[in-house]
Curated annotation (Swiss-Prot):
Belongs to the bacterial solute-binding protein 7 family. NCBIfam families: dctP (TIGR00787), TRAP_S1 (NF037995). Keywords: Periplasm, Signal, Sugar transport, Transport. The keyword Signal applies. The complex comprises the extracytoplasmic solute receptor protein SiaP, and the two transmembrane proteins SiaQ and SiaM. The keyword Repressor does not apply. Part of the tripartite ATP-independent periplasmic (TRAP) transport system SiaPQM that catalyzes unidirectional Na(+)-dependent sialic acid uptake. Binds the common sialic acid N-acetylneuraminic acid (Neu5Ac) with a high affinity. It holds the Pfam family DctP. This is Sialic acid-binding periplasmic protein SiaP. It is found in: Periplasm. It comes from Vibrio cholerae serotype O1 (strain ATCC 39315 / El Tor Inaba N16961). The lineage of its organism: Bacteria, Pseudomonadati, Pseudomonadota, Gammaproteobacteria, Vibrionales. It comes from the Bacteria. GO terms for biological process: transmembrane transport. InterPro entries: DctP_fam, TRAP_DctP, TRAP_DctP_sf.
Length: 321
């Protein structure tokens, strides 16, 4: 009997030890598809976490909106049903209106400028509100490309935008960019854009350069204007419910891994953009560099309206950072 009890105790002890030492598996959902830069960086994050934790932290990836769109996944983070996802800093404007300022056309000059906003008192205030109200902890933000404009006619200046039927997503900042630049904003589903460009149902569209290449818009549009109108980022957000369950050691590993992979991701996107301009030129695309100052001037009514709605002069402060 004593022997059986000893064996039972030994088994229970081993089971407890195995439970304590079991790997932590986190779930990360995203809208990006397999093969995209975002997915590849998430895969790199999974590999980096496993390496840095010696196999104790694993990251399971759910790409291609398997878990819903970005709003659905953020809601899952709030409830603690999902651990990690991507979201743009300016996207927080849906819940925290002042955050939208960073995505207004021509407010962010480049990613370094956007990062200064993210790390400023303004950005910290937004992140604090994300945490306190929605259970979202922003670990870092990564560069995800700058939006440029393709068209079926050369765009050498803002004057060339007049009457241009420009496909944009159904988002305020993109609609405002088109309208205030003199174009005719034409919202439509992303999946319909290629055919619409091919048949001249629309005259142009706007997206980051990697998207223009991936979707092969350059096959049906022979003009690319470097309008630099909106800088895209993607925050890596973890559910605070998940964060509080982690040990201090695991938190440190995750934070360092996110920053390490973020640096690589940002550099990859910047390198891609530089190489893609040359690629498009080699494909016979006419690349133009219109003066951006008239575009910024055209956005002034939007900035004034935004500040008025928020009740404070946010835009000018962010633009000056």
């Amino acid at each position: 009997m004593k022997t059986i009890n000893k064996i039972t105790i030994a088994i229970l002890t081993l089971s407890a030890a195995a439970s304590v030492n079991a790997a932590t598996t986190l779930k990360m959902g995203m809208q990006a598809s397999v093969g995209s830069v975002e997915y590849n960086s998430a895969k790199m994050l999974a590999d980096t976490l496993e390496e840095m934790s010696q196999g104790e932290i694993k990251l399971a990836l759910y790409p291609s909106a398997q878990l819903g769109d970005d709003r659905a996944m953020l809601q899952q983070l709030t409830l603690g049903d999902l651990d990690i996802t991507y979201a743009e800093f300016g996207r927080m404007g849906l819940w925290i209106p002042r955050a939208e300022a960073v995505m207004l056309p021509y407010v962010a000059k480049d990613f370094d400028h956007l990062r200064r906003m993210f790390e400023s008192d303004f950005g910290q205030g937004v992140r604090d509100e994300m945490l306190q109200k929605f259970n979202w902890r922003a670990l870092d933000t990564w560069y995800n490309g700058t939006r440029e404009t393709t068209s079926n006619r050369p765009l050498n200046s803002i004057e060339d935008f007049k009457g241009l039927k420009l496909r944009v997503p159904n988002a305020k900042q993109n609609l405002n960019y088109a309208k205030l630049s003199g174009a005719s904003p034409t919202p439509m589903s992303f999946s319909e854009v290629y055919l619409a460009l091919q048949t001249n149902a629309v005259d142009g569209q706007e997206n980051p350069l990697p998207t223009i290449k991936t979707m092969k818009f350059y096959e049906v549009q022979k003009n690319l204007a470097m309008t630099h109108h909106i800088v895209n980022d993607q925050m890596v957000i973890i559910s605070e419910s998940t964060w509080q369950k982690l040990s201090d050691t695991d938190k440190d590993i995750i934070q360092k891994a996110v920053q390490k992979v973020g640096d690589a991701h940002t550099q990859t996107v910047k390198t891609q953009e530089a190489e893609l301009v040359s690629f498009f030129k080699s494909e016979g695309i006419n690349v133009t560099y219109p003066d951006l100052e008239p575009f910024r001037e055209a956005m002034q009514p939007l900035y004034k309206e935004f500040d008025s709605n928020i009740g404070q002069p946010i835009v000018s402060k962010l633009a000056a950072m």
